[in-house]
């Protein structure tokens, strides 16, 4: 899929992140749960899906006809990057034919010993037609990844690295700066409410991913329980 076609499909809509990790209530070794989440999202009018693991992506593709942002979360201790962190994950995701592959593009030390620029270059050389989304935490990381060759940047990791601000809302400042610089941006991270989603789109971002506020019952219930307890 070409970049312009993808952006046209997801523009001004909601891409729903459908993920569950081992230890979470909706995770199943047998699979079959995330496709139902994706189906519900599609019925609601979602314009895309973000999914983790080859299994979930393939299962979702069978029942939902929406573009997918694919990732593979795999730990490589002691290094911190775990979202599509090496070429092994890239190869696995390309084989699924997912429309976009998202990868950690932070400035943190990587398991493979490459700089993020070297990693992006190696991906583009091996898979020149694959769309890439850079999961970043700061403006500098976003700008660097975009200049290195990714198609879109995401604010996915803002608040989750030592270099980024800790807050319980979207990084509006980062989003505004990226839009000002005309860097294609997919907003993601701590978008908890429809009001916040509207504010994010008012900034002028190209697309938006929402996960926890829609597909993580534990987070949703916790937010309500915490709110009524604050009397």
Swiss-Prot record:
Coiled-coil region list: none
InterPro entries per record: Aldolase_TIM, NanE, RibuloseP-bd_barrel
GO CC terms of this entry: cytosol
Keywords attached to this entry: Carbohydrate metabolism, Isomerase
Catalytic activity reported: an N-acyl-D-glucosamine 6-phosphate = an N-acyl-D-mannosamine 6-phosphate
This protein's record includes keyword Protein transport: no
Functional summary from the UniProt entry: Converts N-acetylmannosamine-6-phosphate (ManNAc-6-P) to N-acetylglucosamine-6-phosphate (GlcNAc-6-P).
Name assigned to this protein: Putative N-acetylmannosamine-6-phosphate 2-epimerase
Species lineage: Bacteria, Bacillati, Bacillota, Bacilli, Lactobacillales
